[in-house]
Amino acid sequence: MPGNKTILYASTHLGGDKCPETGDLRRGGKYLWPIFNTYDIFVADLNGKIVKQLTNAPGYDAEATVSPDGKKIVFTSDRTGDLELWTMDIDGRNQKQITFGLGYDGGAFFSPDSKQLVFRSSRPKTPEEIQEYKQLLSEGLVAPTNMEIYTCDVDGKNLNQITHLGKANWAPFFHPSGKKILFSSNHESKSGFNFQLYMINVDGTGLVQITDQSVFNAFPMFSPDGKKLIFSSNRNNGGTHDTNLF
């Protein structure tokens, strides 16, 4: 958060003392994500003390990030019946829905100039895909197996699909120049479990592969000067399920 004295995060703690039940997260060979309707967005100080609750609408409010200029927050909410992107002022006021297409819009980040957003979306198209998406969502689930990278202005205008790779393309993040996007994808993985990092121009050209180890690589973020990036990977974990930062 602005000033580096508080942290923005989502939590289900108002829904009960115990973690929400996840149930079976595999169905028909697909991996599923739970969408807990007890998630809300909070601000806490560096000691963990909650100083403000920003959302209190029924349903899922999570995946919040702050604009570089410190004025806006983008987040995902299903309060209108679908998983859409919303924005709000840094103090939680003026909450506004900015995407309206059927599908799971989430994982959004602002561009360095705070004027655009990059996010991943499932956007089902065929009748079968639409039916499956709606059925899973009614159960508080999504199948993150077919997602592409999109950009739009902070008001939702000028929506553009950046990738057309198939499979799961997600965890996008802008390069500090604002001209490239870093993301994770399994589109070249036969098993679907190996994710590599890629970079692409904001117009969808110039796809470049960044990592090459046949493991899980995701959640990349650039340093402010663009010279370094940090990401999560399960490489070098000795055969365990550990995921570490690199």
Report each predicted region and the residues it spans.
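Blade-loop segments of beta-propeller domains
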Residues: 1-2, 14
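Residue-level detector of Asp-centered blade-edge/turn motifs that repeat once per structural unit
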Residues: 2-3, 68-69, 112-113, 176-177, ...
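Hydrophobic beta-strand positions that form the internal "hydrophobic ladder"
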Residues: 7, 73-74, 117, 181, ...
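A flexible loop/linker signature enriched in serine peptidases of the S9 family
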Residues: 10-40, 53-61, 76-86, 99-104, ...
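Short loop/turn segments that connect beta-strands within beta-propeller blades
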Residues: 45-49, 89-93, 153-157, 201-205
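Tandem repeat domain/solenoid detector
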Residues: 72, 89, 153, 179-180
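A structural signal for the main folded, soluble domain(s) of proteins
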Residues: 109, 208-211
